[in-house]
């Protein structure tokens, strides 16, 4: 569905209304009657409703350019969700519509991107909720509930070697990050290793610049953290690693925001300005 449709008991607008079918909901056509479709509509939470809807705004496998129509409606819904006075629940509409592109048109050139966008919307919505809970501040990642990885893993499984699979793998790093470092070197050290491993395993990913910066920022933070732990040698080693990572991000991605941020980080490190904690001159 690319519109909100009222579902009726009979193929007549004067008949009893059973409910509404939102954008992106799956409908199975059971019968037709002139300009009407008898459908079984999935309304969420395993709720099914059978009735009649007007044959308008229903995209089927046989619909010409159906994948582009669904994708376009998803993009429009995502735009609505980003607006201050946008349509209510437009983010959920976009999530479902993108998924329908993949589900109904798996061979479409838009399918991989659509599945990733659907997964990303779900990820971001869950992340806002999970990170607002007290458990989000726990030091260890396993002490809090993580975002559901099912759709992200599906992207990686169905479209390996694509940039969408690379981006899905990058998003899943969120579930491995500590909530609060609590001034300990364990978390930033582990996280820097994770980002560096990502760069090594996904060298063509659109997220490489960000991953390099994320690793460099954590290595830079360790410069001061190791000092508080009386580990001067490790502090110097972290400084060298941070400089190397920041230089790589800056030189390889000079036109990106991450490249510029890496250049700033490099400047602070070389100037001896702490990038973590409350250290002052």
Which positions does each model-derived feature cover?
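Boundary regions of SH3-family modules and the immediately adjacent low-complexity/disordered segments
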Residues: 11, 16, 40-85, 104, ...
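Beta-loop motif signature
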Residues: 1-34, 76-85
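Heptad-repeat amphipathic alpha-helical coiled-coil interaction surface used
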Residues: 95, 102, 118, 125, ...
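SH3/SH3-like beta-barrel fold
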Residues: 24, 37-42
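Amphipathic alpha-helical repeat scaffolds of TPR domains
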Residues: 64-83, 109-134, 161-180, 206-227, ...
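Terminal, low-structured helical/coil segments at or just beyond the last alpha-helical repeat
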Residues: 186-191, 235-281
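Short coil/linker segments at helix-helix boundaries
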Residues: 79-92, 124-153, 178-193, 221-250
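Short solvent-exposed coil/turn linkers within tandem alpha-helical repeat scaffolds
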Residues: 14-15, 88, 101-113, 128, ...
